[in-house]
Amino acid sequence: MASRHYSAKNTTKKIRNIGIIAHIDAGKTTTTERILYLSGTIKHLGNVDEGDTTMDFLPAERERGITIASAATSFNWNNHTVNLIDTPGHADFTFEVIRSIRVLDGAVCILDGVAGVEAQTEKVWKQASEMGIPKIAFVNKMDRAGAGFGRTVKEIVSKLRTRVALLTVPVFSKSSDQVFEGVVDILNGCVITWTTGGDGKQTVVVPVSEASAEVQEEYQKARTALVETLTELDEELVEKFLESEDYMQITTEDIKRALRTATINNDIVPVLCGASFRNIGVQPLMDAVVDFLPSPAERPPTDALIAKSYTGGKKSKVIPERAITLDDSMKNLCCALCFKVVQDPQKGTLVYVRVYKGELKQNSVLYNTTSGTKDRVSRLLKVHADTTSEVTSITEGNIGVILGSQGLATGDTIVCHSIKKDGVMKLPPDNRLIQLKPIAVPPPVFFVRIDPASIGDTRPMNEALELLLREDPSLNVSFDDETNQTTLSGMGELHLEIAQNRLIEDFKANIVIGPIIISYKETLNEPTKSITKTVEPEPGAVSTVRLRLEPITEMDEACENENVIDHEQNTVSFPYELSDADLESVGEGNQRISFERDTKELTPEIMEECFRVGSIPPLVSCGPVCRLPLRSVRVVIEAWHIAQHINNTASLKTATRLAIMEALSTANATLMEPIMNVYVSVNEADIGLVVKDLSGSRNGQIVSIMDPSQLNEGDIHSEEYVAMATNTYVPADYTMYLSKHQDQTRTQQSVVHARVPLREMVGYLKTLRSMTQGRGSFTMEVDQYEAVTPDKIQPIVDSIFA
């Protein structure tokens, strides 16, 4: 494969890193296929239903017709390099969406013109907004009966809470069935129509002045509304307007400048429409991506951390982490984030990276600041789904792939010297501690047991699991030494199903997989007695700790010097300085321990790390009921002692671990289970069945039944955007009457909000589809963990040990 450089025109200002986000089935992958085809990147149009799309290249994706992994592709549009990521829409793959959004500079949100703003649309929109990602909206499927462009635009304003700028509005044929055939381009003052049944390349462009009177009137309304909205955000445009006092006299160039600024500042969202499956409206969408979404140079400086470090010797101390931004003062630094790892059956390990600073060159020596290891870049690629082209470097702001590295995992930060290929160790020491803010992994709630089919299959199984975890850190693998069982946990049923398929089909692991099990936890019913443990690894090197465990309730206030141990809401509190009474009682029986050392060597930060690290192992795997992880437990360090000549805390960590294990061995504990907030969208006719099922056989509690527009009722900001939506210009939805039944079905949907134990939601999607003839949908998220009722404990224990 020939290597090649990208030409000088591909500077940072000419780069667009964008992602496609949406609810499942809104048309993300289909839109991407059309973009690739119209840009000349592919020669054949793929079809999701036929399983031959370019971006959905995993076998499981083509089989199910859904996107699972975020495929990345690069192409050219209007003399710009566009790096595009097609993300999943299914809620089980939220982490895949989050880690993709992390590396974007802009996003295109695809909406179904019939369904409007859906549950997952709101979720991914919120995720992008929290990261400050500018967005464009594309109302898709305008060729479908019941599609409502105006209605969907108003939902964008009210539900997604944003101003909008309409750049295209739909055009329909004058026949009785009013076929969607094109758009009015508001910026350029023309009507664009596409040949029916064509591939999207054949268009007819007519000036608005030559269009019908109705189209001319709609164009004037839309352009006036666009300029009027922008004058609320741009003072320079106000001055232009005051010169003529006519919105129609504002030039296209002035509108584009103001709109670009407002979009990049997240003050407004450009909105376009089309029908990707019919190849209509895609070119104006891509023109808008280039014209209005930011380049990497127009995004805020990249935030990073200088990681916590330690100085050695007798005066050892912790240097706390500190926040920084990557700027021009960091000479010769190349810094990149590994945001995705894929095991390709032909090419091997593909590590997708976004370069935030400097230039990543072939054959450079890398330093992985996450793991503290070095590696070398052998080959670099630009990727188009499952095809690649080799490059000699990846420039600042660009996205590419490192081929063949075995030491990199999703979320790792890598640094190297931008000029000297082996100069990484010549960078300032702080540069080798830089960590781009890690991608937060949500805690998993489902798990399955995985066993090798035979003893000889154990090693291949473990190797396959290691590869899988490098790809997807939202999966978690744990091993129980006592039962010799391996457990794989994930975000949902589909998530684990896909992971199992990857292990068997792609990694050829010969394994036996158990049924889906819920992620139960354990907690204490009451405090334990105090336990004292002494460790003496060598004569005179005594470390002693006295501690107790107690449950944390919602009413508890944090203790002094209390520190969070893990994401299970476990904490540890300890006294940094001990009183004489504490010291006299540290020992057991007649033993008295004196405390005479100079504590300057053992700073509060070092002691916090000591007790936290010592607490983690037993809290993860020593639950007294089922050896499950503990939750909402406070480790109270009552007293501690380290012999004066010891300069580290290793033995005290051991004493802490052993003391917690002993305390747990006789603790009064119970099980906790995840309680989910479940939101079920159903037609009014199906509400009775759904409510009966949730509150009856599934032991759920119905919180409310409401219209979707009421979900944020009472929120002053929500009310503000509802009012804004009412006053937002939109064209009339002439085609909605063509599907009165479908529109009625949609507008009469309600949302049932219930709190349901997760164990009762396993397999719920199939039941819901059966009850609603396939029309119902639901989302759920963890509300909190609650104690299992006594009558349910033994059946759950039996199922865990089955």
UniProtKB/Swiss-Prot annotation:
Segments passing through the bilayer: none
Alphabetical UniProt keywords: GTP-binding, Mitochondrion, Nucleotide-binding, Protein biosynthesis
Chief subcellular location: mitochondrion
CDD domains for the chain: EF-G, EFG_III, EFG_mtEFG_C, mtEFG2_II_like
An example Gene Ontology molecular-function term: GTPase activity
tr-type G domain: residues covered: 13-297
GO cellular component terms, A-Z: mitochondrion
SUPFAM superfamilies: EF-G C-terminal domain-like, P-loop containing nucleoside triphosphate hydrolases, Translation proteins
Residues noted as binding GTP in the record, renumbered to the chain: 22-29, 86-90, 140-143
A biological process from GO: ribosome disassembly
Subcellular localization, as worded in the UniProt entry: Mitochondrion
Organism superkingdom: Eukaryota
Additional notes on this entry: This protein may be expected to contain an N-terminal transit peptide but none has been predicted.
Function: Mitochondrial GTPase that mediates the disassembly of ribosomes from messenger RNA at the termination of mitochondrial protein biosynthesis. Not involved in the GTP-dependent ribosomal translocation step during translation elongation.
UniProt record similarity statement: Belongs to the TRAFAC class translation factor GTPase superfamily. Classic translation factor GTPase family. EF-G/EF-2 subfamily.
Protein's UniProt name: Ribosome-releasing factor 2, mitochondrial
Phylogenetic lineage: Eukaryota, Fungi, Dikarya, Ascomycota, Saccharomycotina
Designated gene of the protein: MEF2
